[in-house]
C-alpha cells in the first residue's frame, strides 16, 4: 500500500478574511500540511478539538480549497473547478451527525438520493441501493423510516448513501462522536470490513484512541500541523509525546503502563486489550 491516492502538499487554510487596514481577523486552521493517503489503507487522523483534523477532512474531497498548497485526488487537483465532480465521485464523505445527511423518509429512498441526482437509470439505482445496504448490514431496514433507527443504524444508512455513489475512498469525520459504545463498535466494524474485504481506502477522523488502534497508520494533528505519523504501535509507544499533545493513550496502553509502574514486567509494545490479556496469561502461567 505505497501508492498515494490522495496527496496534500503544503496545505494551509484560514477561516475569516483579512481586513483592508492590514489587520487579519483570521484563524489559521491548517498550516503547511503535508500528507499522503495510500490506496487501500485505513488511515486514522487524531487530534484535539481545533487541531485542524476536520478542516483537513473537508479538503480531501474539495468541500474546502486550500489558500496555499494543493490537494491531489487520484492525480486531480482540487483547485481546478472542472475536476470537482470527478473528485467527489471518487471521495465520499460521512459526517458526525447522521441526521444532517438523511434527506428522505424511507431508508432505501435516502440511499438512492445520490445516484438519482447523478441521473442514473432506475435499474442501476436499485442495484446500487441494494448493494450499499447489504454492505452495511441494513438490507432488512430498507423500508423503515431512518428516524426510527438507532444512532448506529442511522450512521450506517449515511455510510450506505456514500457507498451508493461508488467512491474509491471514504472520509469519515468523527462518525462515532454522537454514538453510544455499542453504536461506535457497530459503525467501526462496518467500515473496517469495507476496507479489509472490498479494499476501500478509508480516512477515519476521531478523538477516540481505541478506534485508531485498528488503523494501518495514524496521523496526529495539533495547531493545524501534522505532529506525528506512523503505525498505531509506533505512535502510541511515544506516550510522553502523546500526552504533551493533550491526548489520551488507548485503554490497553494505559493499563499496561500502570501495571509496569507496579513492577509487572510487561512489554512496551502492547496495544490492544487482547494483547494485554495474552501477555498477562503468559507471564503468570509460567512454572
UniProtKB/Swiss-Prot annotation:
Enzyme Commission number: 7.-.-.-
UniProt keyword Translocase present: yes
Keyword Translocase: yes
Binding locations of ATP: 47-54
Listed GO CC annotations: ATP-binding cassette (ABC) transporter complex
NCBIfam families on file: cbiO, ECF_ATPase_1
Protein name as it appears in the record: Energy-coupling factor transporter ATP-binding protein EcfA1
The organism of origin for this protein: Symbiobacterium thermophilum (strain DSM 24528 / JCM 14929 / IAM 14863 / T)
